[in-house]
């Protein structure tokens, strides 16, 4: 094969062109000015409970700017990506030298955001979907540990770290008590465990604690959002029943509504990824983020000099790592997948969560791992982002009959900033060490993904003067699948944008 036809050679050539393009386009990242002028307009402050709102002790960041009627709450997993932008801005003085007042305020706001999440854990035992009482029947992907890492790396405040780790332990306990399932001896066979480690032999899934009255109301909401295709399946399932708690018969349509409410906890509301069986799936991203939680507790208590606790969390994180490598990993593809807890087998749905093991730095750093990751990028990354799920027409590895016939926004062709970020950081983690060529390819792909993200954001900002919730993975435009009228956004779109703009072109 001639080098001009080789995708690898083209990517190597691209890395040279990339550095040239970064220098040439430095002046073109004009949306940074919009971010600087407007980030504070996304901050609200409601210290007291008010109607459905849960009062928070500090000002908190929301996904939208003042005046927008949607997303006025503080959302759990959104906050991680919002903080990435605040921290990038707050620690990269625009004119060199000392940070100015606004930059210092951005850093302080990031700390306020995490302190608010810690407050919610101490109040409720976990972080809810958002600071509304009506959203306390579910959480969102557990990124508190990642946020604690980000803050402590900058402040080195050990007193704050001790407080944060205490809350993180409580949150971890909640996930293990409320969102986990025991494994069979055959599933953990071969994994080294200690005398008191049997309680850790569990995998986690997304779920909810809604009662039937809430699920009935939620099903009506789904009818309006997802359309007649949802209604058809819901009504058909309601012709049958299942035996629930206390031996009571319940219509099967409620189980469908419950699965979709659990998708809301995953953050992927809604998607074909779980095939409307979310509670039956040990989600790869969830278990990877809980591994990161355990690793944060292990390393955090080591920093604080508490060796006993550190060793305990190190052991727990190693057990989870072994479980993920044993049950979620497929040696034939070299990739990690979701795990079906009802069928006790891999759930083969090609999706962007497959980059999460690399985001949390779980797999080994060797050539085999890196070449498999290169192959995954070829399959899952589009021109302007990462496919949430591949269309079934090209997902040749899928082994399921799709029962999700309604429109879903966490699917092709939508590109979501959180998934882009997880992928970029995962590739960066493995763009070093053994294997020069695959490492180089991962580095180039990471930079290409950042640049295409910036290009997409800048292109639409030039046309509209706004950031948006999601973009088209193929065109970089706003021709996306919506489950509701897409609002102009700030939140994770602006946060990821600001981090990449400052990382690639500097202050």
Cite the ranges covered by each PLM segment.
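Bacterial Sec-dependent N-terminal signal peptides
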Residues: 1-27
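Extended, well-ordered alpha-helical scaffold segments
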Residues: 32, 95-117, 157-176, 293, ...
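Alpha-helical support elements that line or immediately flank enzyme active sites
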Residues: 76-117, 353-365, 420-432
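Core register positions within helices of long alpha-helical scaffolds
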Residues: 85, 147, 293, 300, ...
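Aromatic/His-enriched, Gly/Pro-containing loop or helix-boundary segments
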Residues: 120-164
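Long, repeat-rich segments with strong aromatic
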Residues: 277-304, 409-432
């Amino acid at each position: 094969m001639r080098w001009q036809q080789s995708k690898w050679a083209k990517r190597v050539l691209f890395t040279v062109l990339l550095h040239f393009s970064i220098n040439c386009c430095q002046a073109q990242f004009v949306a940074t000015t919009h971010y600087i002028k407007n980030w504070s307009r996304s901050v609200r402050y409601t210290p007291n409970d008010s109607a459905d709102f849960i009062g928070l002790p500090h000002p908190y960041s929301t996904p939208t700017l003042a005046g927008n009627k949607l997303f006025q709450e503080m959302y759990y997993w959104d906050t991680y990506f919002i903080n990435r932008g605040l921290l990038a801005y707050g620690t990269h003085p625009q004119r060199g030298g000392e940070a100015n007042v606004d930059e210092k305020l951005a850093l302080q706001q990031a700390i306020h955001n995490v302190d608010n999440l810690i407050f919610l854990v101490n109040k409720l035992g976990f972080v809810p979907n958002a600071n509304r009482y009506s959203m306390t029947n579910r959480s969102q992907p557990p990124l508190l540990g990642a946020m604690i890492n980000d803050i402590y790396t900058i402040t080195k405040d050990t007193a704050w770290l001790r407080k944060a780790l205490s809350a993180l332990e409580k949150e971890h306990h909640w996930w293990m008590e409320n969102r986990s399932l025991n494994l069979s001896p055959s599933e953990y066979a071969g994994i080294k465990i200690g005398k008191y480690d049997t309680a850790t032999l569990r995998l986690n899934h997304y779920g909810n604690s809604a009662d039937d009255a809430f699920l009935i109301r939620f099903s009506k909401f789904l009818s309006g959002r997802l359309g007649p295709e949802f209604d058809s399946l819901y009504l058909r399932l309601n012709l049958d029943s299942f035996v629930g708690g206390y031996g009571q018969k319940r219509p099967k349509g409620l189980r469908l509504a419950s699965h979709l409410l659990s998708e809301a906890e995953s953050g992927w509301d809604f998607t074909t990824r779980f095939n409307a069986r979310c509670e039956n799936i040990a989600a790869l991203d969830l278990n990877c983020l809980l591994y990161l939680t355990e690793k944060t507790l292990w390393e955090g208590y080591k920093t604080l000099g508490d060796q006993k606790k550190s060793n305990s969390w190190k052991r727990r994180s190693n057990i989870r790592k072994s479980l993920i490598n044993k049950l979620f990993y497929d040696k034939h593809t070299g990739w990690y997948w979701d795990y079906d807890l009802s069928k006790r087998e891999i759930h083969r749905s090609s999706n962007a969560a497959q980059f999460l093991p690399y985001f949390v730095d779980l797999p080994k750093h060797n050539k085999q791992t890196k070449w498999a990751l290169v192959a995954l990028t070829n399959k899952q990354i589009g021109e302007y982002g990462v496919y949430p799920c591949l269309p079934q027409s090209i997902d040749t590895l899928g082994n399921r009959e799709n029962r999700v016939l309604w429109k879903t926004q966490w699917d092709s062709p939508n590109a979501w900033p959180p998934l882009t970020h997880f992928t970029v950081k995962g590739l960066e983690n493995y763009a070093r060490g053994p294997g020069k060529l695959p490492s180089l390819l991962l580095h180039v792909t990471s930079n290409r993904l950042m640049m295409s993200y910036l290009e997409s954001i800048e292109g639409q900002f030039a046309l509209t003067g706004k950031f948006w919730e999601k973009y088209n993975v193929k065109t970089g435009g706003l021709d996306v699948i919506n489950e509701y009228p897409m609002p102009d956004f700030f939140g994770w779109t602006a946060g990821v944008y600001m981090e990449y703009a400052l990382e690639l072109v500097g202050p």
